[in-house]
């Protein structure tokens, strides 16, 4: 893959329309979540990120890395953009406990249920379903898990839950489509980072970036990457001369996002 310095040099010499200096210093974090309904939010500090995302989330970890290092112009970043990949369904599995509060905040409205003695996953989910009712645009289902689904795919929405409700997101939007939707709302950013480390998804994002006035930084924990293998993302992008993408190999890339 191309060296980052080479990528910046190419952009400076080949562009017919100059990119603002500010945009070089602003990264985009693209991730799959339901913490807010708009496509993007801009943050000025990791403290602001922490108000929306838990410290264990991928978004927070990536933002902490970004705010903790210099940007491509050699100065601390002034801000970063977090972009949302559309999620159309979230399944919550309760951690069963007696006399415990469970809460779901759906489109800004909190709903709670407190379990009784002899609680089960079914009684907790039943209680939450009763508390939530039938909100507009959302289908509420499930027996031992709470399933929240948008009635129209692609509808913007937000949902978060207490830590004792473990959520799994279901997304059908492709990463390239998510990137284009984010860029249509906010294009001030210059460098993309994304939480996915699936080779096919990284390659698709790289292909999309190649047609944009942006760059893409990725990382991989693929054991093939530092070898002469031909299945890793580095080999694939080198083969197609993906000049707007650079990569980092690390055995802990999936949790530390070194890019």
Q: Could you tell me what each predicted segment is?
A:
Residues 1-91, 96:
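Extended assembly-interface regions of large multimeric machines
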Residues 98, 102-108, 164-176, 246-248, ...:
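Bacterial flagellar/type III secretion structural subunits and associated motility module proteins
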Residues 77, 130, 183-259:
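A glycine- and small-residue-enriched flexible loop/hinge signal that marks low-structured segments
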Residues 38, 45-53, 94-160:
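Extended, beta-strand-rich, solvent-exposed assembly scaffolds of outer structural proteins
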Residues 82-89, 151-153, 166-171:
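Short domain-boundary/entry signatures in modular proteins, especially
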Residues 45-46, 78-79, 151, 155, ...:
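Subunit-assembly interface segments of extracellular/virion macromolecular structures
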Residues 18, 34-39, 110-112, 149, ...:
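Short, surface-exposed beta-strand/loop "edge" segments at domain boundaries and coil↔beta transitions
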Residues 94, 117-119, 169-179:
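Surface-exposed ligand/attachment interfaces on beta-rich extracellular proteins
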């Amino acid at each position: 893959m191309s060296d980052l310095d080479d990528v910046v040099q190419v952009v400076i010499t080949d562009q017919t329309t100059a990119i603002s200096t500010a945009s070089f210093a602003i990264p985009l974090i693209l991730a799959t979540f339901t913490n807010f309904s708009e496509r993007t939010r801009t943050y000025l500090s990791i403290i602001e990120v922490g108000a929306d995302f838990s410290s264990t989330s991928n978004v927070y970890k990536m933002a902490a890395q970004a705010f903790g290092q210099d940007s491509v112009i050699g100065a601390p970043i002034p801000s970063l953009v977090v972009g949302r990949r559309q999620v159309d369904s979230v399944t919550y599995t309760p951690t069963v406990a007696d006399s415990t509060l469970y809460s779901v905040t759906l489109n800004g409205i909190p709903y709670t249920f407190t379990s009784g003695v002899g609680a089960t996953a079914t009684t907790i989910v039943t209680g939450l379903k009763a508390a939530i009712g039938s909100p507009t645009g959302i289908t509420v289902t499930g027996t031992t898990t709470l399933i929240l689904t948008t009635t129209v795919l692609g509808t913007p929405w937000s949902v978060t839950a207490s830590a004792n409700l473990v959520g799994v997101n279901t997304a059908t939007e492709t990463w390239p489509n998510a990137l284009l939707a984010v860029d249509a709302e906010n294009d001030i950013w210059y460098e993309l980072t994304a939480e996915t480390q699936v080779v096919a998804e990284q390659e698709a994002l790289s292909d999309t970036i190649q047609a944009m006035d942006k760059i893409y930084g990725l990382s991989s924990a693929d054991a093939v990457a530092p070898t002469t293998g031909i299945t890793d993302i580095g080999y694939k992008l080198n083969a197609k001369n993906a000049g707007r993408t650079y990569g980092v190999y690390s055995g802990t890339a999936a949790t530390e996002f070194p890019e």
